[in-house]
């Protein structure tokens, strides 16, 4: 494992986003462009996250004497819903979720019930205690009829890749010199699921580097 030095030049938080600027010093034996590209690719494509992937939706007529729920899928169509069911499901899958590392082996669930005409957001989802929402008031769908009521059972799963990663943006500048080391200035943005420093340290581990914070 090779030694790499990292210095935090800037840290800031804006709304739901962490921002950091790092000065990274590493052995000149490493090809600078290959090193920087590998680091960027790992940050954007190999970070772990949590998303709602399994959605079970049910709908019933409120005017009937007995509520009989029928299962719906993403290709169902209802004029009482302003969005397509496909878009509704997609909005749920795009919700950013946070879980603690000590809960990593647990199952993650949520429920959403829609009984009245209104706009429903992710704040209307009832979550199990081991997961939290990152953003507030993220739109899901609008119900415009008193005739229908809907229920959704949501199961969240962990995954690795661009759909799951908390990393939102990665930029870098390579600084060449004639010394025995090279350096990269790394600009990084993540959502509140994971901080910039932790994400960068994890990427170094994949590259088989040991990071020393200066």
Curated annotation (Swiss-Prot):
It comes from the Eukaryota. One of its GO terms (biological process) is DNA-templated transcription. GO terms for molecular function: DNA-directed RNA polymerase activity; protein dimerization activity. Gene3D superfamilies: DNA-directed RNA polymerase, insert domain (2.170.120.12), RNA polymerase, RBP11-like subunit (3.30.1360.10). InterPro entries: RBP11-like, RNApol_insert_sf. Its EC number is 2.7.7.6. It is an enzyme of class 2 (transferase). One of its GO terms (cellular component) is mitochondrion. It catalyses: RNA(n) + a ribonucleoside 5'-triphosphate = RNA(n+1) + diphosphate. It is found in: Plastid, Chloroplast. Belongs to the RNA polymerase alpha chain family. DNA-dependent RNA polymerase catalyzes the transcription of DNA into RNA using the four ribonucleoside triphosphates as substrates. This is DNA-directed RNA polymerase subunit alpha. The gene is rpoA.
């Amino acid at each position: 494992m090779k030694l790499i030095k990292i210095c935090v030049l800037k840290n800031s938080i804006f709304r739901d986003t962490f921002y950091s600027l790092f000065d990274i010093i590493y052995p000149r034996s490493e090809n600078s462009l290959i090193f920087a590209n590998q680091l960027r690719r790992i940050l954007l494509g190999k970070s772990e996250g949590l998303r709602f992937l399994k959605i079970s939706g049910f709908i019933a007529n409120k005017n009937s004497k007995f509520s009989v729920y029928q299962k719906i899928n993403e290709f169902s169509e209802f004029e009482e819903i302003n969005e397509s069911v496909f878009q509704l499901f997609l909005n749920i899958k795009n919700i950013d979720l946070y879980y603690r590392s000590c809960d990593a082996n647990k199952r993650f669930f949520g429920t959403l019930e829609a009984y009245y005409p209104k706009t429903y957001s992710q704040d209307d989802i009832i979550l199990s205690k081991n997961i939290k929402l990152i953003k507030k008031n993220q739109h899901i769908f609008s119900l415009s009829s008193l005739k229908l009521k809907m229920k959704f059972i949501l199961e969240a799963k962990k995954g690795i890749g661009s759909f799951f990663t908390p990393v939102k943006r990665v930029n870098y500048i390579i600084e060449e010199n004639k010394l025995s080391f090279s350096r990269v200035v790394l600009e990084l943005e993540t959502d509140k699921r994971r901080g910039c420093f932790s994400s960068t340290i994890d990427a170094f581990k994949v590259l088989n580097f040991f990071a020393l914070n200066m």
